[in-house]
Amino acid sequence: MAFSSLLRSAASYTVAAPRPDFFSSPASDHSKVLSSLGFSRNLKPSRFSSGISSSLQNGNARSVQPIKATATEVPSAVRRSSSSGKTKVGINGFGRIGRLVLRIATSRDDIEVVAVNDPFIDAKYMAYMLKYDSTHGNFKGSINVIDDSTLEINGKKVNVVSKRDPSEIPWADLGADYVVESSGVFTTLSKAASHLKGGAKKVIISAPSADAPMFVVGVNEHTYQPNMDIVSNASCTTNCLAPLAKVVHEEFGILEGLMTTVHATTATQKTVDGPSMKDWRGGRGASQNIIPSSTGAAKAVGKVLPELNGKLTGMAFRVPTSNVSVVDLTCRLEKGASYEDVKAAIKHASEGPLKGILGYTDEDVVSNDFVGDSRSSIFDANAGIGLSKSFVKLVSWYDNEWGYSNRVLDLIEHMALVAASH
């Protein structure tokens, strides 16, 4: 069972175990959650509503059990707090992320995908691509092609549209209030705004954007404002790095850092050597090479954590694996700490304030062990090292497809709940 991101996004705050009366009023409860704006350097909450803070006074913050922040679990005492029904979503672009967003949405009780637009894929091929997936396995539900413009997924109809120009997609007529822009094409405010012409209320870009407000669930989604009609869910790598950097910076301070992501192959790469005028190395065969590449993921952390702006940068290695990537963050700390101290802080956050967003493992894992992991970032305690009290290398895994797609839906529902409280 899934639950609203008002609850899921509480991963960015240390919140006491939910009481039945805490969620009695959507508007007032939402303002309570928004009133807590992060942690102090020791990972304790910096601001809380009086009701929550009083529950913390009787014990150390490390013993507090927070609201879970996964897309698949819900505390029994928590009720859905949106205004009415499910949040209706449309998807533009039925690639890797578009398909997984639809897959995951079918297992949630807070979101319903009502339409998919892709000018290059007809309804029959959409059904085939949704049913079979070489990485994540076969779709467990039912898929039927009703006609050229309708799919039936788990007994619910999904409209199929084939428009090249997003301004021509009748989102309002299709019942979609929120649109996932996952084509990889319309990633700026001006381009993504075309969806608003068709009646969409909000657009979520499933990629970094040059000018749209950027959010990472568990890090800065609490800064979202209801007048923001177009937002970016950042990149999968930023979603992995930002929660890790948040914890380390708030506990020890990050003076500067370099990030490397060892990234699985993506659809933009070539199966064999081919032309790539902007990135010559990027045109080399994906299955034959480890390919150095640029990435703005580390710099983008400065957009979601302004206190780290200008302190992080990084690069990528594209490697011949189909899924799951790993971030290597090497950084200088402001406050002296052993590697064991850093591990302890991350473990605490993974079990408390960032549970379901940031994970922790001390087992001897490899990349394939994280296929289908819904968390944004899973810290590998055995893979990192410390050189001194102020210089550490931190390693964190992420399913760059599945985890990211979960966060897209989490961000949508958070936006819907903000709208419901205003």
From Swiss-Prot:
Its EC number is 1.2.1.12. It catalyses: D-glyceraldehyde 3-phosphate + phosphate + NAD(+) = (2R)-3-phospho-glyceroyl phosphate + NADH + H(+). Induction: Repressed by darkness, but not by sucrose. Keywords: Acetylation, Chloroplast, Glycolysis, NAD, Oxidoreductase, Plastid, Transit peptide. The modification N-acetylthreonine is found at T70. Its main location: plastid. InterPro entries: GlycerAld/Erythrose_P_DH (IPR020831), GlycerAld_3-P_DH_AS (IPR020830), GlycerAld_3-P_DH_cat (IPR020829), GlycerAld_3-P_DH_NAD(P)-bd (IPR020828), Glyceraldehyde-3-P_DH_1 (IPR006424), NAD(P)-bd_dom_sf (IPR036291). Homotetramer. Involved in plastidial glycolytic pathway and plays a specific role in glycolytic energy production in non-green plastids and chloroplasts. Essential for breakdown of starch to form sucrose for export to non-photosynthetic tissues, and to generate primary metabolites for anabolic pathways such as fatty acid and amino acid synthesis. Plays an important role in plant development by providing substrates for the phosphorylated pathway of serine biosynthesis in roots. Plays a crucial role in pollen development. Functionally redundant with GAPCP2. This is Glyceraldehyde-3-phosphate dehydrogenase GAPCP1, chloroplastic. It comes from Arabidopsis thaliana. The gene is GAPCP1.
